[in-house]
């Protein structure tokens, strides 16, 4: 008798998401949004908390192990520079895509009555200065960044730990083995937690749809739709072409392989919480473990393609609401500010809103305009987080291919 083929985890995650949408719509039409917040969302929150508690050990041990695996501090620097350049280029493209799309649709946006605009209130968080960001990257306390999950200092600690082991030669070998063992243990725990992803996804999606269902079909539906068109265009065009021509991989195989991470990001709205799943997906698709361990945690902190599209779309929309016509110079300023802000606000809580406040300030728009879209920010966040982690994965695969080819050239040269 032939055994029934079991459904894969990605299939169960997808089923969980669809079931959550259906259940959420039922609860929304029944007016039971508060019920889902009180009784269903907490189960999803437990799942997200379990993922988040792994983030610091995953980043610390995976980056340290990745640096040690690279075996050469020059190679660490080379991989870091390539990664940073790739992230900056895709972020700039994301802003351009967002601006092009929102300008195509801006004729459909109507200015809000002055009475409504006068009632808007939004307290913007102050964005740190560039020098303050640089200073904060280097921690004065070893444990504080880990306790507060401040990822940039944790990344710096991990890089120094790995570099210190490499510099110690044979004496550092035992520490290298310990770090490798710790990473293995953390990854096993991660795999246990990932098994509960379908349940977590179902609970989170149910609550999001039940609570925001009315808002989705409200007057902000058009701007949400424009943002999501931008997300899809960026994924299909920029990432699809990157995977095909830079990573030398079938885009279909890539999207199939990255699906579990995308669904997890869509429901948790956290790049850091999705990091363990993303690392697992990339390694299965052929990324070099030492590269994915280095590139993905870095990307989860500084790569914000989805957020960049969101900045561009929302800035033009808010300008239209105030009846302000943005010039070509303003558009160029949005591209520059959104691209640089993705690094400038890296690791800062509420980075999306802080970045948008910076963009609005640069082009002379009232920061209070953020209040127009703040109510449905969760809907924007689901798409932009998904885009952010997908970009991280394309980078890991691309850098892995470059490093494999570099190693092959060295081997061929040595064989001569």
Predicted segments, located by residue:
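Signature of multi-pass transmembrane helix bundles
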Residues: 4, 10-14, 21-33, 48-51, ...
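Membrane-water interface of transmembrane alpha-helices in multipass transporters/channels
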Residues: 32-39, 77, 214-222, 248-259, ...
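Internal alpha-helical transmembrane segments of multi-pass membrane proteins, especially GPCRs
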Residues: 52, 81, 85, 221-225, ...
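Juxtamembrane helix-boundary/capping and inter-helix hinge elements in multi-pass membrane proteins
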Residues: 68-75, 110, 168-173, 181-184, ...
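Membrane-interface alpha-helices at helix entry/exit sites of multi-pass transporters
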Residues: 75-82, 188-195, 284-300, 328-330, ...
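Alpha-helical membrane segments and immediately flanking helix-loop junctions
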Residues: 255-311, 336-353, 376-398
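Transmembrane alpha-helical segments and their short flanking loops
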Residues: 312-416
